[in-house]
């Protein structure tokens, strides 16, 4: 369920949870995700199959509704996984790759480097990647700033807000370069500018010169 919540956070409309309850989740071990939900109004079952498109977003490729039992829904999921006619989306949008190599080693933020290369942060990296597939880069420099000394903190904060607003059932309007977010819910629209405090030049230097403590040093301070 937690994995499905991550990949479907921006694929499903926020208010669908008011009329349905997700019950079960399935995968074929490859690119397909299945789910079963209960219709809270009609008290019957619906099921769907999701696959990734070229932008790496999961989208519905098959949906079945008005099934009277969960057993019927499970059988439909099983049958759908075994079919050869599942559509694999193919559109013109390439995926938004926050971790692509920009050959910017001199200006790269060490926290970004740690996030990209350390196995310890691999789970966080995968979650950020899933979120970024749905993020619309309005001004065209998000990836460059996300990797940079001066931009990493603010861009991480923007991704956090992007998730927070969606989890709070807001929808987004991403048609303007400013402000950072225009969100709406219940016919109310809010404009938000994300602001962080820039590091002092000497603190930026401290980041680049920072060497992580060894396990022995850490244990000695506990």
Role assignments for model-derived ranges:
Residues 54-112, 207, 214-222:
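Mixed-charge (acidic/basic) macromolecular-recognition segments
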Residues 137-173:
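Acidic-basic catalytic patches of nuclease active cores, encompassing PD-(D/E)XK
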Residues 86-152, 203:
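Interdomain/boundary linker segments immediately adjacent to catalytic/signaling cores
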Residues 34-36, 47-49, 128, 146, ...:
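Generic structural hydrophobic/aromatic packing signal, biased to beta-strands
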Residues 165, 181-183, 190-198:
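Conserved catalytic cores of phosphodiester-cleaving nucleases, focusing on short active-site segments
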């Amino acid at each position: 369920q937690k994995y499905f919540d991550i990949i479907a956070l921006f694929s499903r409309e926020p208010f669908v949870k008011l009329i349905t309850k997700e019950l079960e989740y399935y995968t074929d071990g490859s690119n397909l995700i299945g789910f079963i939900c209960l219709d809270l109004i009609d008290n019957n079952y619906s099921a769907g199959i999701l696959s990734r498109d070229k932008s790496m977003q999961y989208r519905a490729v098959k949906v079945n509704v008005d099934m009277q039992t969960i057993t019927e829904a499970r059988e439909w999921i099983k049958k759908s996984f075994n079919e050869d006619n599942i559509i694999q989306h193919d559109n013109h949008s390439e995926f938004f790759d926050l971790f692509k190599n920009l050959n910017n080693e001199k200006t790269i933020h060490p926290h970004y480097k740690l996030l990209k290369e350390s196995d310890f942060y691999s789970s966080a990296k995968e979650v950020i990647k899933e979120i970024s597939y749905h993020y619309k880069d309005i001004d065209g420099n998000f990836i460059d700033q996300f990797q940079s000394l001066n931009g990493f903190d603010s861009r991480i904060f923007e991704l956090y807000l992007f998730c927070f607003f969606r989890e709070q059932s807001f929808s987004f309007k991403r048609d303007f370069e400013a402000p950072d977010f225009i969100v709406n819910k219940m016919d109310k629209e809010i404009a938000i500018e994300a602001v962080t405090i820039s590091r002092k030049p000497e603190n930026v230097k401290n980041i680049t010169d920072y060497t992580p403590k060894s396990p022995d040093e850490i244990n000695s301070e506990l």
